[in-house]
């Protein structure tokens, strides 16, 4: 990539042995990955082993490339999106896909979003929780959300570029503490920024059970009540009104947390999440949901139907 674009910072795979690769950022090691990150055959075998019928494919967030020159980010987005779309075309009963778009330049992001929906037949896009430090409430990004709503495209928001990560490198804290906070940052930005208010038909899902947002929703509400001069400057609607207006995934790792999430967000707005194939995911997707004492109808929603509603697909789409 450095040779192609003339500067560094890109993620490359170093296939140092069969079935394994190092994700490298220039000469710096980022993480080790296995062939289930790039080989659809391996993915389908592992899905069969764990009872997963359909996966929604998306780009690894570190490859959003919002830091890059916009034209280059658009180019690499096209490469990534074409790859995902090709897998979906080859295996339409096993996969659907989300694209990635160069949000550092909204006009180019909208162009690629339109291509994802109209030409590649993807169902939406995955984006980060911020864009080079800019919150998702920023007016420059509203046109992207507006285009997604008009296109009927689903949006999945995953934490990335974690705030404060340099100050908490030890103990894996960026993943354990920073990511939940980043997700809450994204939700609050879209609530207080009026994105959901202005675009009521926008279908957005947030990763990792909405991060720290559900547990701090009361604190956020209190902030709105006591300091509207700080919280309600762009949207005067009570933040609690938006509970149940967006989706979160089910990846909370704990039965009590899942019960709370259902109570706070709603049983119709929680979709099965796996974080596959990474270590903070659920190795056997749906195992927690299946273990809970919920009615079968509710389990069906959590395991399947809610995701289809968020994606905007009919229930029999993969039949």
Predicted regions and their residues:
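Helix-coil boundary/capping segments in enzymes
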Residues: 1-319
